[in-house]
């Protein structure tokens, strides 16, 4: 009797097990699991690995009840300023948070899920999607069967950052993301603290202004500011800021070395601009020294020595700038003397 009971029990367990294998998770179960994962993820971006790609994409028959937009990331490339992966990742999370906020109470909120795949432990997924370069974003629609044929963002779609990503999502999914909700630069608490500081310091500032005891009344501050503005203008700082140029890059032939100067006229590293700006500033300061200090020296010999020293340093600085320009552009600068001098 005991043997028969054990056999019946084992048979029952086997039937349940086979039934489970024959009936994988339904679409609603997968969608609910994605919603659960999204609720615990930062900005609603779900971290995927190789198993998740198989579970939620390749193992699910089409049409799926949801779309997935995936950002491909590589932590070891975050230091590459030209790729700007951390910035694009933040913008992608911003689009995700905006979409969830604006579609939280609607059925559309469960039709699209934002995900990210990191290359360290998911190289197989990169190969499945045929990811050859970063940044890369793929949209897996409900009818996508071949992952290599998923909708991908073009290079131009990244120019507008979060706004361009939102346009791509709306164009491909017909869902509404709405305007991007960027976090304020200053929180309400910080604004309150700043206002309190201004209110407290206003009487003190007014008193100092009336007495002429502020930094704006100190001629040395204006002198330093003028030198800074001059250096800022001649060193190409705005070029570096606008184009986000790095100070230096690693040598392609030897990764242990750094490159500060590039022999290319269309590209300039930050170190190049600062070097040229420093030389220009030296010449400008020497000119100010000669016209404001040397002329007041009473001894003629000291005047001449100071003038010769200033001219020598200025000549050296200008020569370095000309040499760098010749090296980058490949064009030589030749002096042309008046015909009467050639005698």
Swiss-Prot record:
The membrane topology term of the UniProt record is: Multi-pass membrane protein
**Leader peptide range in chain numbering:** 1-22
Cytoplasmic side stretches: 207-220, 295-304
Q: Which residues lie on this side of the membrane: Lumenal?
A: 23-185, 242-273, 326-343
Q: Where in the cell is it found?
A: Endoplasmic reticulum membrane
Glycosylation (residues): 105, 108, 146
State the source organism's domain of life: Eukaryota
Which PANTHER family does UniProt cross-reference here?
DOLICHYL-DIPHOSPHOOLIGOSACCHARIDE--PROTEIN GLYCOSYLTRANSFERASE-RELATED (PTHR12692), GH11935P (PTHR12692:SF0)
**Record's family?**
Belongs to the OST3/OST6 family.
Query: What's this protein's name?
Result: Probable dolichyl-diphosphooligosaccharide--protein glycosyltransferase subunit 3A
Q: Which species is listed as the source?
A: Arabidopsis thaliana (Mouse-ear cress)
- The gene that this protein is the product of is OST3A
């Amino acid at each position: 009797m005991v043997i028969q009971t054990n056999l019946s029990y084992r048979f029952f367990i086997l039937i349940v097990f086979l039934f489970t294998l024959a009936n994988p998770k339904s679409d609603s179960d997968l969608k609910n699991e994605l919603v659960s994962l999204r609720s615990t993820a930062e900005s609603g971006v779900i971290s995927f690995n190789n198993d998740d790609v198989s579970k939620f994409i390749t193992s699910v028959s089409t049409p799926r009840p949801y779309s997935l937009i995936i950002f491909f990331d590589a932590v070891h490339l975050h230091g590459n300023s030209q790729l700007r992966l951390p910035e694009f990742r933040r913008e992608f999370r911003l689009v995700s948070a905006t979409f969830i906020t604006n579609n939280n109470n609607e059925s559309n909120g469960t039709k699209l899920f934002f995900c990210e795949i990191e290359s360290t432990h998911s190289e197989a997924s990169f190969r499945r999607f045929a990811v050859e370069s970063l940044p890369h974003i793929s949209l897996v629609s409900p009818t996508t069967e071949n992952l290599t044929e998923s909708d991908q963002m073009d290079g131009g779609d990244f120019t507008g950052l979060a706004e361009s990503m939102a346009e791509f999502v709306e164009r491909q999914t017909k869902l509404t993301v709405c305007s991007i909700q960027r976090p304020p630069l200053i929180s309400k608490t910080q604004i309150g603290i700043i206002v309190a500081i201004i209110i407290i310091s206003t009487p003190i500032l007014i008193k100092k202004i009336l007495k002429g005891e502020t930094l704006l009344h100190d001629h040395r501050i204006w002198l330093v500011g003028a030198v800074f503005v001059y250096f800022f203008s001649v060193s190409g700082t705005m070029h570096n800021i606008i184009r986000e140029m790095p100070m230096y890059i690693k040598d392609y032939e030897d990764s242990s070395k750094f490159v500060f100067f590039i022999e290319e006229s269309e590209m300039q590293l930050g170190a190049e601009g600062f070097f040229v700006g420093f030389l220009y500033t030296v010449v400008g300061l020497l000119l100010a020294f000669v016209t404001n200090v040397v002329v007041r020296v009473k001894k003629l010999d000291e005047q001449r020595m100071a003038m010769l020293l200033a001219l020598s340093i200025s000549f050296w600085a200008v020569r370095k700038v000309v040499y760098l320009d010749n090296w980058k552009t490949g064009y030589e600068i030749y002096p042309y003397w008046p015909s009467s001098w050639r005698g």
